[in-house]
């Protein structure tokens, strides 16, 4: 998941700290958390003609900008990738700050520097209100695997979860 790799992260396969997937993929924006309202807001801005590179104030998003830009939200912590990849203590401290800023009420923006670029994670999007959540679950979901799996006999693992209910989000 891109959201798990939105900051500098340890890669067990390579046995090293890698850059944010947003830097390596050269994507325009990354979303994290429950995406219903995030995507709705991004779509509304795109519909108004706002270029994707200018969408930098939506909560629950991560974007790259110039190193000297000013984030739209109060910043709780900022680190340089080149230091994070070589200093285990700093990496652990950064992770702690990231962890403490996952709450949509108290969470603040976070920053990582990559050469002349700045990666900004906006604070998390607030959870859906009851009416919004009801609307999501009222959508006409098929509640079955995609038909492309039918030719291979379906998805055996679906039997474990087909009668499950959402406990929390």
Where are these regions (language model features)?
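Glycine-rich beta-alpha loop elements in corrinoid/cobalamin-binding modules
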Residues: 1-115, 119-125
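Functional transmembrane helices that embed catalytic/metal-coordinating motifs
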Residues: 28, 168-169
């Amino acid at each position: 998941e891109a959201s798990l790799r939105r900051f500098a992260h340890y890669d067990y396969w390579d046995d090293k700290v890698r850059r944010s997937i947003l830097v390596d993929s050269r994507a325009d924006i990354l979303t994290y958390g429950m995406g219903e309202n995030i995507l709705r807001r991004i779509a509304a801005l795109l519909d108004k003609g706002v270029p994707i590179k200018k969408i930098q104030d939506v909560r629950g998003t991560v974007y790259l900008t110039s190193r000297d830009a000013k984030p739209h939200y109060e910043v709780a912590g900022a680190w340089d990738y080149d230091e994070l990849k070589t200093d285990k203590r700093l990496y652990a401290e950064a992770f702690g700050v990231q962890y403490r800023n996952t709450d949509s009420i108290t969470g603040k923006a976070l920053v990582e520097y990559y050469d002349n670029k700045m990666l900004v994670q906006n604070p998390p999007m607030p959870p859906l209100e009851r009416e919004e959540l009801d609307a999501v679950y009222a959508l006409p979901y098929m509640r079955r695997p995609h038909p492309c799996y039918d030719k291979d006999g379906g998805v055996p693992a679906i039997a474990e979860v087909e009668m499950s209910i959402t406990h929390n989000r």
